[in-house]
Amino acid sequence: MIIGVCGFIGSGKNTVADYLVREHCFVPVSFASVLKDTCASLFGWDREMLEGRSEESRIQREIIDEFWSERLGIPNFSPRYGLQYIGTDIMRKHFHPDIWVIASERVLMRYRDVVISDVRFPNEMAMIRRNGGKIWMVDRERPSWYDVALNAPEQMPEFYPHIHESEYV
């Protein structure tokens, strides 16, 4: 069984996936795993930092990598920016829109029960359904910051240099 979990930021997608892994022996698969492996190797970033869910790893992903920022001439080049830019702006837009979906599909075919907790795009949902999977939408009471975050990128884009359109709430 394949279960794709989607929902807004902070809704509990990983909590649902962790439960399925712990209690029902599901294998966790991520659309972003191959991208994170690639960026960790290319830029010399710690793989655990790219994957980590701790507050510390979230903060580290936002810190500008001065070495790469200077060498590439890209101000504000942080791990988060690098992941988004390479993942979406380069690979999805200029190589193949389904590159991460295809890479993940190849992985999930090896297992019987799989949970994917980072479902964000329609092509990801389509692949899950095409392989007989289900999409679970995690819906809980929206946090107090939700409405502010929903409109913030349109109101003050200059203050959000690391937010890519795929990350808007």
Q: For each of these PLM feature ranges, what is it?
A:
Residues 118-121:
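Short, well-ordered beta-to-alpha junction loops that form the rim of enzyme active sites
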Residues 6-9, 98, 102-103, 123-130, ...:
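Small-molecule kinase domains that catalyze NTP-dependent phosphoryl transfer to phosphate-bearing small molecules
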Residues 1-3:
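Extreme N-terminal starter segment of soluble prokaryotic enzymes
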Residues 22-29:
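Post-Walker A helix-loop "phosphate-sensing" segment adjacent to the P-loop in P-loop NTPases
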Residues 33-112:
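ATP-dependent small-molecule kinase phosphotransfer cores
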Residues 14:
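Walker A/P-loop
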Residues 5, 116:
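Hydrophobic anchor at the beta1->P-loop junction of P-loop NTPases
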